[in-house]
Amino acid sequence: MKRIRSLWFNAEASYSNLNNSPSLRNKNSTGNNSRSKNYRSFSRFDLINSILLLMMLFLLAIFVTALYLTKSSRLTYSHASRAALFNPLGVISPSLGNHTLNYDPEARESSKKLYELLSDFNTAYYDDENMILGSNLFSKNTYSRQPYVANGYIGSRIPNIGFGYALDTLNFYTDAPGALNNGWPLRNHRFAGAFVSDFYCLQPKLNSTNFPELDDVGYSTVISSIPQWTNLQFSLVNDSKWFNPQNVTLDDVTNYSQNLSMKDGIVTTELDWLNSQIHVKSEIWAHRHIHPLGVVSLEISLNTDHLPSDFDSLDVNIWDILDFNTSHRTVLHSTGTDEKNNAVFMIVQPDNVPSSNCAIYSTCTVKYENSTNPINSSESFEEKDVSSNIYNVILTEDQPKIIVHKYVGIMSTEFNKNKEQQDNTNIGLAKMIALNSKGNYEKLLSSHKRAWYDLYNDAFIEIPSDSLLEMTARSSLFHLLANTRDYNVSSDRGLPVGVSGLSSDSYGGMVFWDADIWMEPALLPFFPNVAQNMNNYRNATHSQAKLNAEKYGYPGAIYPWTSGKYANCTSTGPCVDYEYHINVDVAMASFSIYLNGHEGIDDEYLRYTTWPIIKNAAQFFTAYVKYNSSLGLYETYNLTDPDEFANHINNGAFTNAGIKTLLKWATDIGNHLGEVVDPKWSEISKDIYIPRSSSNITLEYSGMNSSVEIKQADVTLMVYPLGYINDESILNNAIKDLYYYSERQSASGPAMTYPVFVAAAAGLLNHGSSSQSYLYKSVLPYLRAPFAQFSEQSDDNFLTNGLTQPAFPFLTANGGFLQSILFGLTGIRYSYEVDPDTKKINRLLRFNPIELPLLPGGIAIRNFKYMNQVLDIIIDDHNGTIVHKSGDVPIHIKIPNRSLIHDQDINFYNGSENERKPNLERRDVDRVGDPMRMDRYGTYYLLKPKQELTVQLFKPGLNARNNIAENKQITNLTAGVPGDVAFSALDGNNYTHWQPLDKIHRAKLLIDLGEYNEKEITKGMILWGQRPAKNISISILPHSEKVENLFANVTEIMQNSGNDQLLNETIGQLLDNAGIPVENVIDFDGIEQEDDESLDDVQALLHWKKEDLAKLIEQIPRLNFLKRKFVKILDNVPVSPSEPYYEASRNQSLIEILPSNRTTFTIDYDKLQVGDKGNTDWRKTRYIVVAVQGVYDDYDDDNKGATIKEIVLND
């Protein structure tokens, strides 16, 4: 059978090569034409028979192989999607190169307006070309406005002045008690501190825990911070004026700028101080290759233009300080000065861990600009817990600038592999690193930048149409890389990565499932060694997990919910009666590394690393589940699923689906390795209970009612990353689940939710573009300016978000967002199939790309690592391509067949469990026959080195027939509920929505139908869900061919006009090309408006789509025709509910998908006239404003506005 399978793959590849047309878009293939031959008759009849017999045998071999493949097992179980007019056959051809994506300058420019939707962006900026994020606002210290530096070993959060230690002093929302605190479990004052990887302490009790009774059986382990190594200060006039984070006030600072370069991880701060007399510039970086080295550069200079007339000189004392008081949860071991080397040092130990310490050794070079002679420290200063060196300098107009370079060596027991050797003590190594670096600033800076550039050579993501999304992808990659490393990670310890990495003690720096399910998979395709280091931490703590199981009388192993220095059961990280799914998460992460198959990951890794984890988890779950004889199924009890709003429930859906899937993995891996396989695993996997409602919606847990509000993605995790779908009925249930739970996520829930919905929507839905609207929903509510760091919550105000102080930065969201692109939009999955004869696992890559209408030009993922090969994955506007660009081994690829997806076959509740309404737009889908050499679940390809596989993208259909607005661009002109994005109103998904922030003010959405729209709106519909508005209005901007021509060219011309003279020269040409004389005044006002609201809409339009055009109008104010008004074509139409209130649904807690209220309308243009009589071209508008007012039931207790689920506009 193995030989037959090999022949089958080669035959498929050969067949694909026959179809080597350069474009799949226009190919009309039936799947059989390429095989039809015209055979000539031969005189020898037996020869003909022989040929026919061989052909029959060949076809039989293909059929048998396909039959076996149909029965084989998978990690990812999605079995198909059928599409109308979709040809799933791909073309294998020689590689064509880089596949440069189309660049649309208008879309790119428009996307930059999305930055303004980010929290706190009003004084922020982003340099797209140089990947620099920054702010011009000098404010009080608050965590979300602070950048950080890190290199995977050391890290430091940087306060407002650019260096030193600072406590937060500002909360945007409230000054209530606790407003400046971090969240669970420390609930301590937030601070800009310094951290070292794996530097954990032990605490007998914490401020907040889940299971305080467990404090009696084991200490909790949380991260310790070390003395702030960026601590430089300087003072003036006999120390009467200090420059440090505590003493610099807002009034002291002008000309402020602080930025973070994502290209090289350097934070630069510049400002003028003391009436602009002194200019201060600092640069801080953690060396990317020499991990124990931190560097601070400080320049202090006189602004000679602002000095008083009697200025003579300025005495400056520069302090190099190590202060134990800037460290948390540590014990001071020793501190002192090294006068010979102008250095200070300090050694601290984490609380209650005397076997560990961290040594910090700091030394400086201080020079006048253009001088080669360093200045020695004039004084050393030591107190009980502070050591410092003081450098006295004098600034004059002849010597106006002093440059300080601070070199800090930082060495912890956990990083020092050679600590057993006497000459390699932590303080000895820290000293050696600092002194060897001293005086080599430029050389070190160059090597640091080179190390970062080399990292980016291994990974790059392009989204040419959207600057914000591309920036978020790049910043997410940066933040994950800054907090992880490949170098000097012991295989017997691994790399523990906390939720907030190396710049914060949010969540106590502990390791959660965030590392296994969110961060590690995002790094695996680009940096498999880093991902393996992270997973090795779980392997290193596996022996403790076995002890945990033994402690509670179970076989196998049980990982605690939280881990740190140890993985014992604690009050923050219980092992039982809580989130058992952590054991599935750890196993899945390890198995994914095997399925990715980078260098050295073979059956030995599977046998000695992955198998013990999965086997022990299987053994534990086999003992943990209980058989319910009434149901004839296995159940689970007293647990918490990922939705932590529901604790101590039974039969958590994700947990039970995870057990089912893990036991399947255990069986397959055991058989593959020839190990003993417990037959009970297959039995439980087959018969574990997944609770469902009578309407076949998966219940998150047994007894769930209809009033549920979900904290975060839970049931949807069964689709991704678990890959639970394994038959058509479960696929159809998963679609219902996606719809149902999309409407029940908490508006202020964590940023780990919607990346999962991206992947689920892309894989499950054959209509609309909600995979992309969910992508925006993953970013806009959660990303914080100015330094593109994710917050855990969409709403950071703990008084309105359920008393949650968000973790920050939230690396979990960075990992989730990257996965939504890498695996969600591309449909890429690591997968496997089992040979039914040999029981051997065969790894393959699943590729299921779809068109991305909200991302014109597509996406590109460069240097994706798979099976130790390097791939490029390209999704353009028409085709999906995998390029085998490096390596010498073929890879197996599977393209799923989308024919089983029926995402509109949803019957609504109709007041009775036995009666349900059909879906809004249910209709039959044209289906094509199965192509040649394609089993029911997909088509297989063998991609060889230097080849590429190109497949036509699946084109999702319109959710509502002839809706000219669906999948178009949209923005909200008024505020929405935190967490909502306007894209949801046009995404073709009836279960996403945009909701105004309040029901008092008029809410507006602005729609762009795109260039040269030839259709006029004659009717339409608004889908409201369960909360309709009180009234609705629609306005359009009258169409003008001249304005359209101007719009089409202005962005490119404005971008390419480098100066005012060139701009003036090109404006005339621009207007001539558009056929617009400058003197021309055209009255498009048409109808008298009641107010200037419609003119405001024009200004909003120009601000959104064409800031360049707004600038052009300022240059040529006589272009009055550009200032025309929107015209109302629907004016304050009252809204009436189209559906009754289904009281029984709530009273009886029925889990049902309820029908949506809807308002239909028609447009009567006879009552409207714009421009010349008889001219109707103005109706073919491009821009539309939809305005809603209030809610139908104004007397309810909810202050939020109506829910707008879908806007349908028909011609």
Curated annotation (Swiss-Prot):
Localization annotation: Membrane; Vacuole lumen; Periplasm
S-S bridge residues: none
Effect recorded for residue 37 to R: Abolishes its ubiquitination. Normal protein targeting to vacuolar lumen
EC class (word): hydrolase
Annotated segments matching region Required for cell surface targeting: 70-131
Domain of life: Eukaryota
GO cellular component, one term: fungal-type cell wall
Cytoplasmic side: 1-46
Catalytic reaction equation(s): alpha,alpha-trehalose + H2O = alpha-D-glucose + beta-D-glucose
Gene ablation phenotype (knockout): Abolishes cellular acid trehalase activity. Abolishes growth on trehalose carbon source.
Glycosylation site positions: 98, 207, 238, 247, 255, 259, 325, 370, 376, 488, 539, 568, 628, 638, 696, 705, 879, 897, 910, 972, 990, 1031, 1049, 1064, 1147, 1157
E.C. number(s) listed in UniProt: 3.2.1.28
GO molecular function: alpha,alpha-trehalase activity; carbohydrate binding
Residue spans crossing the bilayer: 47-67
PTM section of the record: Glycosylated.
Topology with respect to the bilayer: Single-pass type II membrane protein
Binding site for substrate: 513-514, 711-712
UniProt topological domain (Periplasmic) ranges: 68-1211
Active site (UniProt): 644 (proton donor)
Gene Ontology biological process terms from the UniProt entry: carbon utilization; trehalose catabolic process; trehalose transport
Keywords: Glycoprotein, Glycosidase, Hydrolase, Membrane, Periplasm, Signal-anchor, Transmembrane, Transmembrane helix, Ubl conjugation, Vacuole
Classification via PANTHER family: GLYCOSYL HYDROLASE-RELATED (PTHR11051), PROTEIN-GLUCOSYLGALACTOSYLHYDROXYLYSINE GLUCOSIDASE (PTHR11051:SF8)
Function: Periplasmic acid trehalase that catalyzes hydrolysis of the disaccharide trehalose and required for growth on trehalose as carbon source. Growth on trehalose is strictly respiratory.
Family designation: Belongs to the glycosyl hydrolase 65 family.
Descriptive protein name: Periplasmic acid trehalase ATH1
Source species of the chain: Saccharomyces cerevisiae (strain ATCC 204508 / S288c)
UniProt gene name: ATH1
